């Protein structure tokens, strides 16, 4: 274990972890968008900036990419850090005027309005802040790579290749799950899952043989079975709830006999 000082108070930390992980563990509030515990550090949104006041490299840096070392001293509320954070939040408000999650985050850190756009809380505009979590989860975690950054500058966006229906997307919904801005729309309708945001890429859903509920896309099931060895074939046909009930009915009698 090593010792780091955050806002003049000492904390224990594990060698090699990132400062943002320590901040989160210790309940020290700091905003972030591109960080997610399932993904590698990215340092893109810049919101998790802290000031390093003691240690090898003093200055302002992103805590999600700052590896803690023994004796590191950081301040999360230094005046310059707070100033940069507020300007960034104003920019995100302007970039994603339709995202309630971003409005809430900005409000939490003292920003109600943006100087960079006519900010209207009722606006239903763009919700994406280009943090890239969806791109990275699709690539890094699933190994699918159905979406990526497209275009440049003010036209930057995240999309499927050629802005069309994706043949790669498996409809797992991980992208929507990790999106901090609520920018990805998915509609389940009957036996279909429609990835609205990904140009209405449509996937067939599988029906549970026991409950008759539609529970996952056929492509997701194939993907899982292609990665995991020795999964019983019959589990392909049943929802998570039915799987749990099956396991409970297999194991509970043994325990109840004890
Ligand atoms: S739903 Fe499609 S785009 Fe989203 S993470 Fe899964 S495979 Fe990638």
Language-model segments: residues:
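Short strand-turn-strand beta-turns centered on an Asx-Gly dipeptide
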Residues: 6-9
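Short, structural beta-strand-to-alpha-helix junction motif
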Residues: 17-21, 67
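Short metal-binding segments enriched for Cys and/or His
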Residues: 238-257
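Cys/His-coordinated zinc-binding microdomains
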Residues: 35-38, 49-52, 65-68, 132-142, ...
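Immediate flanking context of iron-sulfur cluster ligation sites
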Residues: 22-59, 86-90, 117-126
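Fe-S ferredoxin-like electron-transfer domains
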Residues: 57-168, 185-238
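Extreme N-terminal starter segment of soluble prokaryotic enzymes
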Residues: 1-3
């Amino acid at each position: 274990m090593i010792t780091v000082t955050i806002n003049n108070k000492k904390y224990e930390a594990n060698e090699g972890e990132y400062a943002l992980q320590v901040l989160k563990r210790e309940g020290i509030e700091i905003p972030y968008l591109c960080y997610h515990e399932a993904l590698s550090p990215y340092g893109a949104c810049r919101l998790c900036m802290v000031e390093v006041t003691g240690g090898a490299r003093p200055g302002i840096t992103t805590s999600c990419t700052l590896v803690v070392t023994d004796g590191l001293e950081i301040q999360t509320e230094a005046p310059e850090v707070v100033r940069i954070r507020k300007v960034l939040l104003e920019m995100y408000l302007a970039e994603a005027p339709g995202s309630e999650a971003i409005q809430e985050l900005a409000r939490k850190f003292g920003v109600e309005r943006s100087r960079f756009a006519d900010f209207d809380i009722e606006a239903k505009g763009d919700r994406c802040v280009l943090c890239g979590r969806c791109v990275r989860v699709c690539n890094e975690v699933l190994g699918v790579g159905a979406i990526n950054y497209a275009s440049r500058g003010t036209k930057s966006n995240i999309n499927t290749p050629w802005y069309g229906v994706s043949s790669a997307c498996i409809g797992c919904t991980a992208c929507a799950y990790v999106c901090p801005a609520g920018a990805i729309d998915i509609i389940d309708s009957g036996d279909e899952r429609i990835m609205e945001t990904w140009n209405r890429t449509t996937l067939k859903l599988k029906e549970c043989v026991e409950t008759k509920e539609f529970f996952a896309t056929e492509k997701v099931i194939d993907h899982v079975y292609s990665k995991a060895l020795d999964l019983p074939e019959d589990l392909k046909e049943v929802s998570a709830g039915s799987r749990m009930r099956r396991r409970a009915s297999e194991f509970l009698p043994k325990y109840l006999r004890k």
